[in-house]
């Protein structure tokens, strides 16, 4: 009977294919991919919804977007009288169309919608929510995912992504909508009057906040190459740099044009060195010193440095975090009660640097919304000077409540330009940090374990660490094990257990005197990540052996 219903359901969807906006994507998919759309449902989680285009409730299409929008409209009207919202969207396939669909549904429920006429960055959306004082915000993006993906992120009134509790409530409202093929959205002039143009003044204010944060960029002969990886950071980043009287940059022209197919990049992810290939070519031709890339929605940023011999040094997210924290510590020496916030899987290096400079630090779960929650709870006397995640997400000043590559680009250029005046590089500065607080090193192993066997393997690894805590790993003596699923920390040397003040998450962190390792399964994919952050000789060898021991 279930198979018959699935077949009927598929037939109904195929009949509506011409109206779905995704017929072309569906027709390009394999039989398995097509079937997945009918055998699963998109779920609204803590990071919103992200998925492939296609037919069925397990894919993004006109009807599933209408269902999401209707659930969100009911949620907003239940939360407050006369709700308002601002929508931004990136350069991906159907981002513009999805934005208009959502705006129409919300307007149909008497919700005022601010909708721009062009693509915008994610940090601009976070700022706009705060600047316009709206009830919520929506960002339509799938960050650096492949071209056949898109997604919807929802923001609360403080410009941060929805809390876990709010996300669960929105999810329930969406589910209560029922069959997306049965939704009827009447559109009238009276309703569309609720859709307002996005004020240019908001973008101007955002630029002013960054200009005030940077002040000026000192004159040096620093040369920069920049790529937006076909995303949203052009034109805003070049305009911002020019407004700060910095013109010594070249754009990777082929990659600085919006392109939903990401035609000129193997990967639109700044974590991936391949994303820099064309930037390296241009840097060699122009003898540039600094290479910067942003991901398609401009919330994350990667950097590399070219020396006089043409050698390229790529910095990982933790190293960029350490450099930026070091610079912010220098910039804010006059402030008291300084605070740095980072995720629990980010480096020991930045914590050591904070301690050395008498800067308080806090650790939060992975996900920038948890950093935003800490910012929201700051006392009046606390000064947040920097926040970051090892996955290349950084925030210098909290007028934005999400990762913000746009404000970081001129900050890193200013830092590099100052160093250039003294004949130094970012690589030199990182080496100085190591000499000051020790050579803490970091690496990440990501394992994809498909199918039922893979799921069992992931569960087995996590269960083993919970039920049989190791005394030592590769000669490193275990001090404590933090289990964020039970919110408990077990101190091995004292044989005591205490509570962790944190929301629950399926993460285990094993602490040593030398640093930590952390295990974190994905909530949506058949993946598990191992983070290694240690100060020890032969780091690479030790990290590889730890990985082999756990996943053999």
Curated annotation (Swiss-Prot):
GO biological process: enterobacterial common antigen biosynthetic process; glucose metabolic process; purine ribonucleoside salvage
Active site: 143 (phosphoserine intermediate)
EC number: 5.4.2.2
Note accompanying the cofactor annotation: Binds 1 Mg(2+) ion per subunit.
Cofactor: Mg(2+)
Pathway(s) per entry: Glycolipid metabolism; diglucosyl-diacylglycerol biosynthesis
Signal peptide: none
CDD domains: PGM2
Reaction catalysis annotation: alpha-D-glucose 1-phosphate = alpha-D-glucose 6-phosphate
Phosphoprotein is among the record's keywords: yes
PROSITE patterns: PGM_PMM (PS00710)
Residues reported to bind Mg(2+): 143, 295, 297, 299
Single GO term (MF): phosphopentomutase activity
The keyword Repeat belongs to this UniProt entry's keyword annotation: no
Pfam family, one: PGM_PMM_IV
Entry's family note: Belongs to the phosphohexose mutase family.
Cited function: Catalyzes the interconversion between glucose-6-phosphate and alpha-glucose-1-phosphate. This is the first step in the biosynthesis of diglucosyl-diacylglycerol (Glc2-DAG), i.e. the predominant glycolipid found in the S.aureus membrane, which is also used as a membrane anchor for lipoteichoic acid (LTA).
Protein name from the UniProt record: Phosphoglucomutase
Species whose genome carries this gene: Staphylococcus aureus (strain MRSA252)
């Amino acid at each position: 009977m279930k198979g018959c219903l699935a077949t009927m359901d598929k037939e109904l969807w195929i009949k509506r294919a011409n109206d779905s906006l995704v017929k072309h994507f569906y027709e390009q998919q394999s039989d398995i991919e097509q079937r997945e759309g009918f055998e699963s449902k998109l779920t609204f989680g803590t990071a919103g919804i992200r998925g492939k285009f296609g037919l069925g409730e397990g894919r993004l299409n006109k009807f599933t977007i209408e269902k999401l929008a209707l659930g969100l409209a009911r949620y907003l009207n239940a939360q407050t009288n006369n709700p308002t919202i601002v929508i931004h969207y990136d350069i991906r396939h159907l981002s513009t169309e999805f934005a208009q669909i959502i705006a129409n549904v919300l307007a149909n429920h008497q919700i005022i919608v601010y909708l721009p006429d062009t693509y915008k960055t994610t940090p601009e959306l976070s700022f706009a929510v705060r600047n316009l004082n709206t009830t919520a915000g929506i960002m339509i993006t799938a960050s650096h995912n492949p071209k056949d993906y898109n997604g919807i992120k929802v923001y609360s009134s403080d410009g941060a992504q929805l809390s876990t509790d709010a996300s669960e409530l929105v999810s329930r409202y969406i589910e209560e909508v029922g069959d997306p093929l049965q939704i009827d959205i009447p559109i009238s002039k009276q309703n569309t009057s609720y859709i307002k143009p996005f004020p240019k003044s908001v973008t101007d204010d955002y630029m002013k906040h960054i200009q005030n944060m940077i002040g000026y960029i000192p004159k040096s002969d620093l040369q920069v190459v920049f790529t937006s990886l076909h995303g949203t950071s052009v034109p805003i980043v070049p305009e911002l740099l020019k407004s700060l009287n910095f013109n010594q940059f070249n754009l990777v022209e082929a990659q600085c044009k919006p392109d939903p197919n990401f035609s000129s990049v193997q990967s639109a992810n700044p974590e991936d060195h391949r994303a820099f290939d064309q930037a390296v070519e241009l840097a060699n031709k122009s003898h540039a010193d600094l290479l910067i890339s942003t991901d398609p929605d401009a919330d994350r940023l990667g950097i590399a440095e070219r020396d006089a011999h043409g050698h390229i040094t790529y910095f990982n997210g933790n190293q960029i975090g350490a450099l930026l924290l070091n610079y912010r510590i220098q910039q804010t020496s006059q402030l008291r009660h300084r605070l740095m916030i980072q995720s629990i899987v980010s480096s020991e290096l930045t914590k050591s640097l904070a301690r050395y400079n008498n800067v308080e630090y806090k650790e939060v779960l992975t996900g920038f919304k948890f950093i935003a929650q800490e910012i929201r709870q700051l006392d009046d006397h606390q000064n947040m000077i920097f926040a970051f995640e090892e996955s290349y997400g950084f925030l210098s000043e909290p007028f934005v409540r999400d990762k913000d590559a746009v404000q970081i680009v001129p900050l890193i250029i200013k830092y590099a330009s100052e160093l250039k005046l003294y004949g130094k590089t970012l690589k030199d500065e990182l080496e100085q940090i190591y000499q000051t607080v020790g050579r803490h090193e970091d690496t990440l192993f990501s394992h994809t374990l498909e199918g039922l066997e893979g799921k069992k393997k992931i569960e087995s690894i996590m269960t083993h660490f919970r039920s049989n805590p190791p005394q030592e790993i590769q000669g490193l003596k275990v001090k404590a094990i933090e289990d964020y699923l039970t919110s408990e920390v077990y101190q091995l040397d004292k044989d005591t257990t205490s509570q962790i003040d944190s929301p629950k998450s399926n993460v285990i962190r094993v602490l040593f005197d030398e640093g930590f390792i952390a295990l974190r399964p994905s909530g949506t994919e058949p993946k598990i990540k191992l983070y290694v952050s240690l100060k020890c000789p032969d780091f690479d060898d030790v990290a590889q052996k730890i990985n082999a021991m756990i996943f053999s």
